[in-house]
């Protein structure tokens, strides 16, 4: 099976040793996105909701670069530095996804890169 790198300048460049996404067959593995502005590579200003919207927009750019849409996402992992934001995260997610929703995990963690409050990665299947 061949694999190819998915890359777009509409999402933040990698800040480590990883690709924005990798396609293997019809499956695309999305690397974690934090709320960095793709133009400045700075963390977006604002509250948890502003950060979450930026993360979804970053993921959307990579998904579209892969030739897909959020309807193709089958698994989403959400990493939160504070589970008190769980309900707000659900509300934000509802703006981007319709039923049937992807499988999902919401995971509490002590900290995230660049002081972000939220990070997401996922898997989509094309075709």
Curated annotation (Swiss-Prot):
PROSITE patterns: UPF0076. One of its GO terms (cellular component) is cytosol. GO terms for molecular function: deaminase activity. Gene3D superfamilies: RutC-like. Coiled coil: none annotated. SUPFAM superfamilies: YjgF-like (SSF55298). Belongs to the RutC family. PANTHER family: 2-IMINOBUTANOATE/2-IMINOPROPANOATE DEAMINASE RIDA, 2-IMINOBUTANOATE_2-IMINOPROPANOATE DEAMINASE. This is RutC family protein in vnfA 5'region.
């Amino acid at each position: 099976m061949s694999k190819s790198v998915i890359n777009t300048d509409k999402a933040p460049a990698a800040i480590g040793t990883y690709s924005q996404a990798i396609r293997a067959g019809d499956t695309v593995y999305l690397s974690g996105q934090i709320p960095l502005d793709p133009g400045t590579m700075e963390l977006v200003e604002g509250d948890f909701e502003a950060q979450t919207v930026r993360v979804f927009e970053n993921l959307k750019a990579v998904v579209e670069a892969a030739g897909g849409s959020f309807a193709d996402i089958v698994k989403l992992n959400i990493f939160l530095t504070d589970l008190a934001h769980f309900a707000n995260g659900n509300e934000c997610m509802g703006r981007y996804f319709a039923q049937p929703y992807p499988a999902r995990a919401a995971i509490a963690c002590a900290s995230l890169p660049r002081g972000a409050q939220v990070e997401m990665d996922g898997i989509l299947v094309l075709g």
